[in-house]
């Protein structure tokens, strides 16, 4: 009987299994069917509780469940699902162990920043206009960079070319953008483009490395730029990459602006060692390196200048301008060392020329000339002369008779005692007829009776050593070089203030047919204002207007330097308001400096009131000036007696403290802020017609 019951049970299992497959929902663990369908869990027939019952009872329970209420089945299934989901969760409720997650404010800020970037990051739109080529983008970026629109060029390349059109860039695309970054010193972006270029397996060219060294030279942060340039140079040396002369010039420019003259000479020797022919442009970068030494740079520049002339190179106009910059900014160094190196005749050609090889006559004339120039340039001898110590330069003392030729000896005896030496003084700027004229630009032009330098401290003194205004221009004429407006502006800065040479500068403009600019006149106005000649500075304004020039803020700033009286300074501010020109912080700084020098605190308070009325932001220089003016004297004793000066400074201190609370501060902008591309936030709201604008098609 038991076997019969088992047979009936298994005979009903096959249609039951088919029925299960037809009504089983794959997404949930319960029956899915109509009202007549079974609504019970899949695991119910196979549970452990049902297997313990007898077969008869199990059959009765199954038949009873088939005829039961569907709502009861649903509640049972839901309860069993909840129990299944809460399985293993009771330990968290009754356990005494607590779990902690590491979290910091920086971590939350980082996660918040990532979410914000994901939300604000614009989705790149696919390009729907006419497709362009990488060469077309190269021409467009080159045109924008030439117009000074570096931001537009970067946006055109990164957004339209790479993201929208999804074109594969060429080496020329990256090189053009790196060159544009090099003009403005955008170091970070230039090396970022260089790294992207290497990731795309594009081979950099000589122009790429030239642009990279140039961006290091123009960077506002010299230390980091020097490290980047040295690292790039080491990478090129590891790859045995041969640089051309243009790239070496960019490297030499970087060494001149970011390092010192010694590194310039190292690069210079490498140029000679590689067989390149040096030009006057090479010596121009060496002159830049000389200018970096503010103490002895003028003497270095004269030695480099003489070497350039001894090699037969004609100096260019830029070389003359750099020599004037050295005369304006750099000193002569030790006068005794300068006298030994610049006044004594030296056989530089013999020292710098190595023995000639016997195989040179077999070569061509062009190769012979190039090798002769490279052979004459013995940089080690020049380096020894440049960095000569005082003890090495002087050596054992020599009697004056040994230094002065016999023909000039009687003339010296009639003028001075034999034990004294003739000295070159700053009076050489306006020499009398009987006084010696000196021009150190030509070694043979130094008279033998001039054996040492006198006091050479001002730019006018250093200009006198190269012949003065007329002697300098005559040397330019010998080398067939005409002065430009930059040359005349530099001459206006180095000539002696109030001298006849300064009045000749306006005549030189017409003589050489040079068109004057505002910088030239601003230089003349500033020099007269520094002398206290405010009326003479104002007299230049009609001359400026006659040449069709309009004064700018720099012109008013130069006029403010000479406003030592309150009447002049306040009148200048009134005239600027009538001209609808708002003074900036530099003009107020010049007026504050003039008031502090006169210790006129009433004048100073009036300047601060006008600055407050115009809401001009305060910079660091103005704060430093006002803090100095608000200090008490070191020997101040309040109880010693009544002091009118101290009563005024107390009133200024009280007003200055209240003035600081209401004045806005001027923020110094980042040098690269204006070159950074901004994300396109309104990509979805822009019209579709904008895709076919000027930069969209050919």
UniProtKB/Swiss-Prot annotation:
Keywords, in A-Z order: Mitochondrion, Repeat, tRNA processing
PROSITE patterns registered for this protein in UniProt: PPR
Biased composition (Basic and acidic residues): 678-690
Domain of life, source organism: Eukaryota
Protein's cellular compartments: Mitochondrion; Mitochondrion matrix
Entry's Gene Ontology molecular function annotations: tRNA binding
Compositionally biased intervals (Polar residues): 62-78
Disordered, as annotated region: 49-88, 392-419, 670-698
GO cellular component: mitochondrial matrix
PPR repeat residue numbers: 133-169, 170-204, 205-243, 244-278, 279-315, 316-352, 517-551, 552-583, 584-618
A biological process from GO: tRNA 3'-end processing
Broad class of where this protein is predominantly found: mitochondrion
Pfam family, one: PPR_long
Family to which the UniProt record says this protein belongs: Belongs to the PTCD1 family.
NCBIfam families per UniProt: PPR (TIGR00756)
Assembly and binders: Associates with mitochondrial leucine tRNAs. Interacts with ELAC2.
Role, per record: Mitochondrial protein implicated in negative regulation of leucine tRNA levels, as well as negative regulation of mitochondria-encoded proteins and COX activity. Also affects the 3'-processing of mitochondrial tRNAs.
The protein's name in its UniProt record: Pentatricopeptide repeat-containing protein 1, mitochondrial
Species annotation: Pongo abelii
Gene name in the database record: PTCD1
């Amino acid at each position: 009987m038991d076997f019969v019951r088992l047979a009936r049970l298994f005979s009903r299992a096959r249609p039951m299994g088919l029925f299960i497959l037809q009504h089983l929902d794959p997404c949930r663990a319960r029956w899915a069917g109509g009202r007549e369908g079974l609504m019970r869990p899949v695991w119910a027939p196979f549970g452990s509780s049902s297997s313990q019952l007898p077969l008869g009872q199990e059959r009765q329970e199954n038949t009873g469940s088939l005829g039961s209420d569907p709502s009861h089945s649903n509640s049972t299934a839901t309860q069993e699902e909840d129990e299944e989901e809460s399985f293993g969760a009771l330990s968290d409720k009754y356990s005494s162990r607590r779990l902690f997650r590491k979290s910091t404010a920086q971590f939350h800020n980082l996660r918040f920043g990532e979410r914000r970037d994901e939300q604000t990051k614009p989705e790149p739109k696919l390009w729907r206009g006419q497709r362009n080529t990488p060469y077309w983008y190269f021409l467009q970026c080159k045109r924008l960079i030439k117009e000074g629109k570096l931001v537009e060029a970067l946006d055109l390349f990164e957004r339209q070319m790479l993201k929208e059109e999804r074109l594969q860039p060429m080496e020329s695309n990256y090189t053009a953008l790196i060159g544009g970054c090099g003009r403005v010193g955008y170091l970070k972006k230039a090396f970022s483009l260089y790294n992207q270029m290497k990731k795309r397996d594009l081979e950099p060219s000589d122009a790429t490395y030239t642009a990279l060294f140039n961006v290091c030279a123009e960077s506002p942060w010299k230390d980091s730029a020097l490290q980047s340039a040295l690292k790039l140079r080491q990478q090129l040396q590891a790859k045995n990459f041969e640089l051309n002369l243009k790239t070496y010039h960019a490297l030499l420019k970087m060494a001149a602006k970011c390092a010192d003259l010694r590194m310039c000479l190292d690069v210079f020797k490498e140029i000679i060692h590689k067989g390149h022919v040096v030009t006057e442009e090479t010596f121009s970068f060496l002159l830049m390196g000389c200018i970096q030494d503010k103490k002895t740079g003028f003497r270095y520049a004269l030695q480099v200048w003489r070497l350039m002339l001894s090699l037969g190179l004609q100096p260019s106009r830029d070389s003359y301008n750099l020599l004037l910059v050295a005369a304006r900014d750099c000193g002569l160094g030790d006068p005794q060392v300068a006298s030994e190196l610049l006044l004594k005749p030296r056989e530089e050609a013999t020292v710098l020329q190595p023995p000639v090889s016997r195989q040179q006559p077999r070569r061509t004339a062009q190769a012979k000339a190039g090798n002769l120039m490279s052979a004459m340039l013995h940089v080690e001898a020049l380096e020894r002369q440049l960095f000569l110590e005082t003890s090495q330069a002087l050596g054992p003392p020599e009697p004056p008779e040994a230094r002065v030729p016999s023909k000039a000896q009687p003339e010296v005896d009639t003028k001075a005692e034999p034990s004294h030496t003739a000295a070159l003084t700053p009076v050489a700027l306006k020499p009398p007829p009987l006084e010696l004229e000196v021009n150190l630009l030509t070694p043979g032009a130094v008279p033998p009776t001039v054996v040492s330098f006198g006091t050479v401290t001002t730019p006018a003194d250093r200009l006198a050593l190269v012949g003065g205004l007329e002697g300098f221009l005559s040397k330019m004429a010998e080398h067939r070089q005409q002065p430009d407006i930059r040359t005349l502006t530099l001459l206006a800065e180095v000539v002696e203030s109030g001298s006849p040479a300064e009045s000749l500068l306006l005549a030189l403009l017409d003589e050489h047919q040079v068109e004057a600019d505002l910088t030239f006149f601003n230089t003349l106005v500033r020099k007269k204002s520094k002398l206290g000649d405010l009326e003479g500075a104002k007299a230049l304004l009609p001359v400026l207007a006659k040449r069709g020039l309009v004064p700018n803020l720099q012109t008013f700033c130069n006029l403010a330097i000479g406003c030592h009286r309150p009447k002049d300074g306040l009148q200048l501010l009134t005239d600027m308001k009538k001209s609808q020109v708002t003074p900036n912080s530099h003009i107020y700084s010049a007026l504050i400096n003039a008031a502090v020098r006169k210790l006129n605190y009433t004048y100073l308070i009036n300047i601060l009131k006008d600055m407050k009325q115009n809401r001009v932001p305060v910079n660091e220089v103005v704060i430093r000036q006002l803090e100095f003016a608000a200090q008490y004297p070191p020997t101040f004793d309040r109880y010693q007696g009544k002091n009118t000066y101290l009563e005024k400074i107390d009133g200024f201190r009280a007003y200055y403290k209240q003035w600081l609370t209401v004045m806005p501060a001027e923020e110094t902008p980042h040098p690269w802020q204006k070159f950074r591309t901004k994300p396109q936030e309104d990509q979805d709201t822009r019209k579709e017609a904008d895709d076919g604008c000027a930069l969209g098609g050919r």
